[in-house]
């Protein structure tokens, strides 16, 4: 970290007793300090992040309250406090906007107010916060040439309003333009995309960056996040990406690897062979060679592995290796958590603010100290 920071009181507990997790506290930069940081320094200061999944990103819920429409309780300050105490110093808040907009693109005031309230839970806790446009690709955003101009207009309309709402927040608040943008249902949806989709996504991200920069306040040099087709680690997708020329930028990818272990679609429940480890090492080295060695910081702002018949020891081994191997390259990670424990990514019990698998949280702490 840079300069002096405000030290918070440190309190530690035995993590092995009664399923408790050791409480972790750390340094919170002042506004002047964080606003003077480069995007690389901000990534250096992030230890590990947590995703508020299946909450403000919910949609098509047939519910008057989309936040709880996918089965999670309303987000509370206590939830974010619990995340902070467990050693996460960054929170990603996925938000889907498309169902909360008038025909002219105006975002519903009550929705924006609620998003701001949840951002404040994390921001006022001294955490780094990522705010994004999440499942809008399932509502209106399709990266094809035919839709480029209309989608660019919608995307910039959303970001103008987000920028106006948050322009006075310091640089612990980070904007991520889009999430896993892809042509849903196409043959290339998860295989890296096409040249047409690369061209469109590159233009959309450039429009996002331009919109943020033009919006004034702290947004003129706020760190922003861009990515490739589907936020994919496929080499063709990464090769098709044009990173906007900007001094305050991060590249983010989503890497649940290997998917047959991490994802819910396969029965593979074990992990830890030499070839398993080599696969991760090779991926992280590729990201280092492609971006980091050229001065572009990288985060993986979604990763994790699901519970498969309580394969907790394999998951502990995976988290330990994955996070420490990424850290060697300066890559910081955000764990996906949807509060789903049966074949899901749930770690935090959002009803009582306890951790379902304290040993996984301990492994995350140990790997990211």
Where in this protein do the model-derived segments appear?
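Gram-positive cell-envelope targeting signals
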Residues: 1-16, 333
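Acidic/histidine-rich helix-loop elements
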Residues: 52-75, 102-107, 146-147, 260-280, ...
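Solvent-exposed loop/turn segments at secondary-structure junctions
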Residues: 54-58, 90, 96-101, 135-139, ...
């Amino acid at each position: 970290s840079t300069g002096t920071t405000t030290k918070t009181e440190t309190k530690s507990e035995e993590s092995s007793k009664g399923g408790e997790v050791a409480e972790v506290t750390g340094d919170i930069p002042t506004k002047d300090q964080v606003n003077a940081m480069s995007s690389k320094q901000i990534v250096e200061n992030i230890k590990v992040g947590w995703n508020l999944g299946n909450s403000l990103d919910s949609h098509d819920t047939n519910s008057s309250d989309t936040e709880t429409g996918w089965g999670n309780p309303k987000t509370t300050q206590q939830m974010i406090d619990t995340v902070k105490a467990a050693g996460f110093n960054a929170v990603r808040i996925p938000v889907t906007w498309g169902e909360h907009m008038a025909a002219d693109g105006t975002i519903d005031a009550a929705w924006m107010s609620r998003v701001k309230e949840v951002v404040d839970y994390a921001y006022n806790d001294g955490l780094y916060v990522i705010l994004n446009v999440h499942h809008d690709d399932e509502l209106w955003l399709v990266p094809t040439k035919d839709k480029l101009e209309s989608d660019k207009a919608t995307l910039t309309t959303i970001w103008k309003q987000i920028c106006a709402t948050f322009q006075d927040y310091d640089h612990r608040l980070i904007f991520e333009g889009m999430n896993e943008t892809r042509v849903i249902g196409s043959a290339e949806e998860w295989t890296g995309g096409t040249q047409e989709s690369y061209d469109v996504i590159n233009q959309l991200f450039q429009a996002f960056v331009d919109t943020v920069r033009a919006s004034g306040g702290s947004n003129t040099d706020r760190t922003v996040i861009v990515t490739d087709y589907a936020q994919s680690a496929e080499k063709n997708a990464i090769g098709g990406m044009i990173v906007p020329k900007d001094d305050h930028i991060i590249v983010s990818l989503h890497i649940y690897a290997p998917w047959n272990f991490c994802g819910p679609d396969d029965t593979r429940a074990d992990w830890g062979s030499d070839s398993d480890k080599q696969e991760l090492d090779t991926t992280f080295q590729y990201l280092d060679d492609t971006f980091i060695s050229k001065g572009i910081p990288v985060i993986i702002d979604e990763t994790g592995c699901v519970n498969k018949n309580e394969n907790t020891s394999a998951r502990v081994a995976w988290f330990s290796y994955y996070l420490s191997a990424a850290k060697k390259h300066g890559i910081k990670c955000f764990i996906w958590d949807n509060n789903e424990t049966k074949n899901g990514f749930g770690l935090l019990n959002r009803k009582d603010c306890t951790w379902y698998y304290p040993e996984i949280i301990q492994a995350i702490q140990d790997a990211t100290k």
